[in-house]
From Swiss-Prot:
GO cellular component: cytosolic small ribosomal subunit
Acidic residues composition-biased segments: 230-239, 248-261
Any GO BP: translation
Family in the record: Belongs to the universal ribosomal protein uS2 family.
PROSITE patterns tied to this protein: RIBOSOMAL_S2_1 (PS00962), RIBOSOMAL_S2_2 (PS00963)
Protein name (Swiss-Prot/TrEMBL): Small ribosomal subunit protein uS2
Keyword Ribonucleoprotein belongs to the record: yes
GO molecular function: structural constituent of ribosome
NCBIfam families per UniProt: rpsB_bact
InterPro entries recorded: Ribosomal_uS2 (IPR001865), Ribosomal_uS2_bac/mit/plastid (IPR005706), Ribosomal_uS2_CS (IPR018130), Ribosomal_uS2_flav_dom_sf (IPR023591)
Region: Disordered, residue numbers: 222-261
Keywords from the named record: Ribonucleoprotein, Ribosomal protein
Disulfide bonding pattern of the chain: none
Amino acid sequence: MVSMRDLLECGVHFGHQTRRWNPKMKKFIFGERKGIYVIDLQKTLRYFRYTYNIVRDAAAEGKTILFVGTKKQAGGAIKEYAEKCGMPYVNHRWLGGMMTNFGTIRQSIRKLEVIEKMEEDGSIKLLTKKEALMLTRKKEKLLAYLGGIRYMKTQPDMIFVIDTVKEKIAVQEANRLKIPVVAPLDTNCDPDLVDFPIPGNDDAIRSVQLFCQEMAEAINEGKALREQDGEANEEQPISEEEKKEVLEEAMSEEDFEGDKE
């Protein structure tokens, strides 16, 4: 469980410049120093511990918690700690509809599985060099966008977000679907959009890493309480027709749906 010393050492108390703030965050601000808001770490500690227990209990109930953080400071930690606790993640770019249009996202993940099967069974070697190259490129693009959620069979039960301002589309989708949002809140954030806020710096690498590490720890603790193995992912057979469809799509050089802003 996080301590006051952890928060101080990781710079969790440093907010944004005073000209860049959301007035709704006033109750979480301790004061101002050299034009920078200082977050009240007593409140951070209280919210952190409360949220830790919420996340732990969700994991103990077998719920899926999606990690989201696509900015440079967050991408590495999001992937590392999501993998450490066996949860899905998005760290490249949030594609509109990842939750609200999940069926279409699952179809794209299926295409990734088809290409990988073609590589595995050798059928990709029967294609021309150009066809094989186009399929490989498509696979790389699909992996970049969807690799972290490929085993997520349904919408998540909760999302953990680093930087709710940058990830506003993900937060909006979660709010629309009534999926609880857990997130650190910097002084420029809107607390009304987050179900389980933790006031703190969401920009500094060490601070971001601490948040991710603690959430992963809470999840692993919850999983241990659950005392049962997760269900194995069933592999769905891939037909020749599916292989043909994915190849035709790759050869058409159409932009992957998610490329469009």
